């Protein structure tokens, strides 16, 4: 019997769909290599009756991928509804599944996935996960902060400027790449 791996996907960022696609491919590869792996949407979670059989590898991942993509939340509306019920970010049974897993594969992209928030929660709960720790994730999510940390250490970085709201742009040479400071890698 192989390791039990929970692949967390989805979430609430603008990169939700790419997260689901990435996680589907990762899960397929893990299964081909003998691991008991399955996908859970970190925001929507899973029904209680499916928790015990989560690592059985018997679901159709392509069908699950399509289903999850169709569950795209109206984030603000959903978060307000959860607040009214006294619930937080994590979907039903997500944390319980992650605690049962031998390790959690972080298939999330963007905010609430790559920015250290989930990593911090997992560290507090003793949940093992892939990727960088919460502080490294938080620093690297901000392109401006990353540059401020790495350049003084002599690590080469491409030239760039950070523009803030109300900032008057004097000159930006072309060609250039425009990215949101704290957006995920697939935005911009």
Model-identified regions with their sequence ranges:
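ATP-binding N-terminal substructure of ATP-dependent carboxylate-amine bond-forming enzymes
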Residues: 1-135, 139-141, 145, 149-152, ...
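Glycine-rich phosphate-binding loop of ATP-grasp-fold ATP-dependent ligases
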Residues: 19, 174-188
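Short secondary-structure junctions
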Residues: 154-156
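Conserved beta-strand elements flanking the ATP-binding pocket of the protein kinase catalytic core
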Residues: 161
């Amino acid at each position: 019997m192989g390791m039990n791996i929970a692949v967390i996907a989805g979430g609430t960022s603008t990169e939700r769909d790419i997260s689901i696609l990435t996680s589907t491919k990762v899960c397929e590869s893990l299964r081909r290599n003998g691991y008991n792996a399955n996908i859970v949407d970190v925001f929507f979670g899973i029904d209680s009756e499916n928790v015990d059989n989560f690592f059985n590898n018997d679901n159709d991942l392509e069908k699950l991928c399509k289903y999850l993509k169709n569950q795209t939340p109206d984030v603000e509306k959903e978060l307000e509804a959860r607040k009214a019920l006294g619930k937080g970010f994590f979907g039903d049974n997500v944390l319980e599944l992650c605690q049962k897993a031998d390790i959690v594969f972080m298939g999330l992209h963007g905010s609430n996935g790559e920015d250290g928030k989930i990593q911090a929660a997992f560290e507090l709960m003793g949940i093992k996960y892939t990727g960088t720790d919460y502080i490294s994730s938080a620093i690297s999510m901000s392109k401006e902060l990353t540059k401020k940390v790495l350049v003084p250490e002599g690590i080469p970085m491409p030239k760039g400027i950070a523009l803030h709201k109300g900032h008057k742009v004097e000159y930006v040479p072309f060609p250039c790449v425009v990215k949101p400071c704290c957006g995920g890698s697939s935005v911009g």
